[in-house]
Amino acid sequence: MKFQKYYGIPKDAKYGEEFMGRFPILFQDNKKSMQETCMCWGIDCPIGWYHILEQLCTYLEFHNQQFSKEYGIAVVADQVKEKFGTLRFYFSIAFVDKETGLKVGPDDENDETTSETAALYVARDYLDMLADEAIGEAEMMTEDTCADCGVPLTKDNKVETEGWITFLCDECNAKREEEYANRLNHQENVEQKS
């Protein structure tokens, strides 16, 4: 998959129900309990990656629509989060209803290998490969994208914060440092008054 370069973050961008609702097959587990899925927590990523996640999810949902109708399989998100400064997108290939795209249990009653089941396994492996490649590319892109504003990072403007790993541009890093200094000053003033 080829991702487009940064095209900006919409002012109303967020990863809530509306975002996930645009990709109903991919995010079909987001309303399930925490005993069933980590998607109950939603998408836990910096807003600076919005354009990357939007393109990735559009790509995966496109393939989901094709593979669910043809083979009854789809990519279903298990967890989407930031970890160590980059995207982590965990998924599974699920058996789905060919009409609705919603998960169904596998047909375990027939253990025979037929040409139809052989084609299904080939399709499943191919869909898994497509998803792995696209997700891998997206994960690498997040390392070179400012977590706050989404601009592409280069070795000249990339700052890796200490402690909690985050990749920021110089401008966003300066804003965070200023906010942190202001919080420290406020805390010191409160402590002096008491």
Name every feature range the model reports, one short phrase each.
Residues D156-T161, E179-A181:
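Short Cys/His-rich "knuckle" micro-motifs
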Residues M141-T145, E162-I165:
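Short metal-coordination and nucleic-acid-contact micro-motifs, chiefly zinc-binding Cys/His arrays
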Residues C146-C149, C169:
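Short cysteine-rich clusters marking metal-coordination/redox-active sites
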